From Swiss-Prot:
Record-given protein name: Hemoglobin subunit beta
Pfam families from the UniProt entry: Globin
SUPFAM superfamilies: Globin-like
Modified residues (N-acetylvaline): V1
GO molecular function terms noted in the UniProt entry: haptoglobin binding; heme binding; hemoglobin alpha binding; metal ion binding; organic acid binding; oxygen binding; oxygen carrier activity; peroxidase activity
Organism the protein comes from: Leptonychotes weddellii
Length: 146
């Protein structure tokens, strides 16, 4: 991902304030609510029968945290996202058969959740930088697909 020094600084500064547990669960939960067809990848997560069930599901929250911890790794390696996400790309492609379009959807949901959490601090410039990052991460995760 090609970010200016200013964009990198904005992304890093905001990310330092992110509560990964809370934001991860909320982002994944919202993905499952807004795009219900993504639920098929989470059969083992138990009750996903309603928005309330999804948003309060401990497995959704735990996996959301895991996703954002991986995203944090990506932020530390913006110059090598494909390398950083190579194993996860392989797993999601070869074993889990996740549609790579879902990575873009989750990235966009994450941007919305960050905007919701940070309000005025999430300026248009910060949003633009995060859109570049989530697009880069989605691209890296889709890399192993043929």
């Amino acid at each position: 991902v090609h970010l200016t020094a200013e964009e990198k600084s904005a992304v890093t500064a905001l990310w330092g304030k992110v509560n990964v547990d809370e934001v991860g669960g909320e982002a994944l939960g919202r993905l499952l609510v807004v795009y219900p067809w993504t639920q098929r990848f989470f059969d083992s997560f138990g009750d996903l029968s309603s928005p309330n069930a999804i948003m309060s599901n401990p497995k959704v929250k735990a996996h959301g945290k895991k996703v954002l911890n991986s995203f944090s790794d990506g932020l530390k390696n913006l110059d090598n996202l494909k390398g950083t996400f190579a194993k996860l790309s392989e797993l999601h492609c070869d074993q889990l058969h996740v549609d790579p379009e879902n990575f873009k959807l989750l990235g966009n949901v994450l941007v919305c959740v960050l905007a919701h959490h940070f309000g005025k601090e999430f300026t248009p410039q910060v949003q633009a930088a995060y859109q570049k990052v989530v697009a880069g991460v989605a691209n890296a995760l889709a890399h192993k697909y043929h």
